[in-house]
């Protein structure tokens, strides 16, 4: 996964 990737959306 790319750097800063998260499985959740950050608002």
UniProtKB/Swiss-Prot annotation:
Its main location: secreted. Coiled coil: none annotated. One of its GO terms (cellular component) is extracellular region. The keyword Secreted applies. GO terms for biological process: defense response; vasodilation. Belongs to the bradykinin-related peptide family. One of its GO terms (molecular function) is toxin activity. Keywords: Amphibian defense peptide, G-protein coupled receptor impairing toxin, Secreted, Toxin, Vasoactive, Vasodilator. The lineage of its organism: Eukaryota, Metazoa, Chordata, Craniata, Vertebrata. It is found in: Secreted. Produces in vitro relaxation of rat arterial smooth muscle and constriction of intestinal smooth muscle. May target bradykinin receptors (BDKRB). Expressed by the skin glands. It comes from the Eukaryota. This is [Ala1,Thr6,Ala11]-phyllokinin.
